Amino acid sequence: MIKKIFVFSLLSLFTPLFSQYSISEISKDSYLKDFDVAAAILLNQHPNPYRFHSKETVTKKLDSLRKALEKDPSYINFYINSPGRVLGDGHTSFSTDANYYEDYLNSTYFFPLMTYVNNGNVYINGDNKYNIEIGSKLLEVNNKSIADILKQIPASADGNIKVEDVDVSQYISFLNRNKDNTFTIKYQTLNGEQKKANLEGIKFTGFNYESKHAVLPIDATSEIYGIFGYELNPDTFYLSVKSFSYDESFFYEKLKKYFQQIKNKKYKNLVVDIRNNSGGSVTNIPLLYSFMSKEKIFTNSYKYGSKVIDINYSDYLIDPQTDRYYSEKDIRDSNNFMRQRFDKSEKGDYYFGNNRLDDTYIKNYPRDGLFFDGRVVLLTNNRTFSAATYFASLFKKEKRGDIVGKETGSCSNFTTAAWFLTYKLPNTKTTISIPRTEIFFNNNENDNIPNCTGVIPDHKIDDNFFLNALKEKIDPELQYSVELLSRTS
């Protein structure tokens, strides 16, 4: 059986699971106990908990988050101030229990305006009954500046990568916590005039409806199909890949279909869109690139490493598929699996994956027969994550074309990955997902990388271009790419 190695990005903070409890039963002491358990799990089980911050700094950050929770022991505050915030690991996730979260949603009034962030500015991203123009800039909510609100939003990213691809409207709702169902905003109109407005909160069903009718993102079809392509103009083909979590044979058949079409129609340009691609199977990365490589053979280089190969924290460890707690045999089998596939390095305290780890790994990867040799533009954003960041990193290393959009959410040279462990906290029933290894891209395997950047785009969208596209209800990055290709033809 072919073994698949998956690199998943768990970007959603609030992913429902199943249980039978209500929020009113969770006491302050229960929140604090679960916080302490979660912190212990992370510090003992994460493959490199002090990658970005010293032990002293991590301890101080945890103390600060715990004090914030102690001051306001509420359901949503438990997640906003979760211990996972201190590590700088976008793969580590805290997920809610379905019934608890449903109770919370039913008791919460949501911000009624859809928003979108570009270059640190928050813009109105949909029609509304208050006649606030699409493209108006949001300045304050309930006397709190947008800058302060953005700082409070937990970022799903590696290291200190600046993330602005977040659902600001949702977090305004979570952070507001007022009981009178109102939001007082200050905003700037398109002609520069500052105004105030009083808004009525809406229930979750209404919020969900509004979010589905926002202007951006435009490409809703690809979000449904995962892989989707079509002609932009007689010279240019658009290929959107929203996930790499496909069986390799299925993925190849889809790519073969589109690249055969590209060859038959003799397109000169290709726009590849991996915005909002949260990752998947790392073996699919060179597969996609093989259809556009300029070289007959290109280097596909990645390596797994971890400082923790054993299960050090076994309490509350569960099988996420069955919700069953791990037995001693489960733990023993898991430890044996890792010990057989990771060898201690001669220097440092890392264990690196050996040849037994990945029998699908091909370092010198051949170009596909249907390869495209024209010009390529790659679209990325902060939600280009995990394995998708490896694709962007490979694309940039090979100098295959221009990258348009925003910095990726994972580091360009490494991230965490693979063989996730899942824990269920005893009181809040929160599940924690922790990766067991790191993965290093393109021959980067430095033990001590205190800072990282994502893959940096060659072209970012300035506010004027963004606003014009938003008002016209056009995809800003895609429109910029088409114009870029036309200018350089």
List each language-model region with its residue ranges.
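Sec-dependent N-terminal signal peptides
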Residues: 2-17
